[in-house]
Amino acid sequence: MDIEKFARVAHKAGVPLIVDNTFATPINCRPFDFGCDIVTHSTTKYMEGHASTVGGAIVDSGNFDWTQNDKFPGLTTPDDSYHGITYTEAFGKGAYITKAVVQLMRDLGAVQSPNEAFLLNVGLESLHLRIPRHCENAKKVAAYLKQHPAVTWVECAMLEGDRQYDLAQKYMPRGTCGVVSFGVKGGRAAATTFMDSLERHPGGRRSHLLPAPGIYHPSPADGRTVGGLRRAPGSGAPERRH
């Protein structure tokens, strides 16, 4: 998406822009540089990198003024469950992330175990090495699929001519991620046959595949991509067969 454009619209409306940067990771995309206020990550994917933990992260830029309007009473009025504190008065622009830690994490229990946090830290050490390889492999796979007679369409923003190519060059010039979307001839039945021969789960070291109906199952049937697949090439050889 055009981050700067969305940031202008959000700020004009008096709300923060929150960007899910899971697939691009901070290696490829730095949303704060383009006006984003808060970034989220599913660390289960590329950050951890080995499909061994479940986790997430919220990163607050500290740039958004939560007191500019009355849209955030949870931050601008006293919290009776936490000593009657008013987060904006006590923490200023850090009110959002502080509330997330001291109240929401407490109430929801969304805290990693020490071992999972350790595994995440281990995975982060190789993130800068893994991401370029994922992107390189994804680009090769996408180029191959575009020429394959059984493939009807391919979406990969790293390929010239892709509808998102210009935006990708603006926000992620070093690469987007290891995810490639494509459709196969024969519709859902053909996609299922192809998918069933592969391992499935995105964002790890290994190559995986997910079907569009599985990703968008709650959506209306006419809103799903028939025969669409999303492949996430791993860090191994791009021509590897499964």
Where would I find each of the regions flagged by the language model?
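Conserved PLP-enzyme active-site core in the AAT-like
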Residues: 1-147, 155
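Active-site beta-loop-alpha junctions enriched in small/polar residues
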Residues: 22-24, 159, 241
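Residues at secondary-structure transition points
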Residues: 55, 62, 129, 210-211, ...
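Short hydrophobic/aromatic beta-strand micro-patches
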Residues: 59, 181-183, 239-241
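Conserved C-terminal alpha-helix-loop-beta "cap" of PLP-dependent enzymes
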Residues: 131, 146, 150-236
